Amino acid sequence: MSNKKIGITLRTGNASNYNEQRDMLSQDWPPLLEKIGLIPIFIPNSLEKISQFLEEIEVDGFILSGGDNVGDDPLRDNTEKKILEYTIAHDLPTFGVCRGMQAINNFFNGSVIDSKNSKHVDKPHIIKIVNEKLQQFLGKTIQVNSYHNNTLTSKSLGENLQEFAITDFDNTIEGIIHKNKPIIGVMWHPERTPNKESQLILKTVFCDKDFWK
């Protein structure tokens, strides 16, 4: 069986010493995906016909990558909105990372809160897995990295989304999953800590069809 192709979104930024805007992705992502048998397909932000592009590349799922905040870049916001519309229509697994999880939550009419807790910024911490299906391969607690200033709570959670992971110190939401679509998001960065749990959750989301039954 051939490896699955996974579309992955890109952050934008200015290249130093060049007068041009570029799409960018951390180099941590390709080796992690390669290790678990996934082929990354980069999704540019500047296309006018995004839906047509998504049809033609024929990927098996999507990763909404991290970096910056929802609302900072209208082009990227629009690209990821189109991806979510496409993945819902085609029932393709989608995995949101940090900003990507926030984009999923916003898409389903949720919101994010500016965190006042310094434990969320650049500090690893323990999270509790509160979903039985994910407990089967992640266990009841795992340690994750943390680079985000925004948080989600039960009051800010989007429609048809449910929490599957919460922090052990303030019960803010670190992981969400859609109730009836193959859509999941995490606030930590699996690519920055490519350990067993990071590989397991990605491989399960994209390669285990039974997980979404």
In which residue ranges do the predicted regions lie?
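Residues that recognize and position ribonucleotide moieties
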Residues: 125-127, 142-145
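Active-site-proximal beta-strand elements of phosphoester/diester hydrolases
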Residues: 184-188
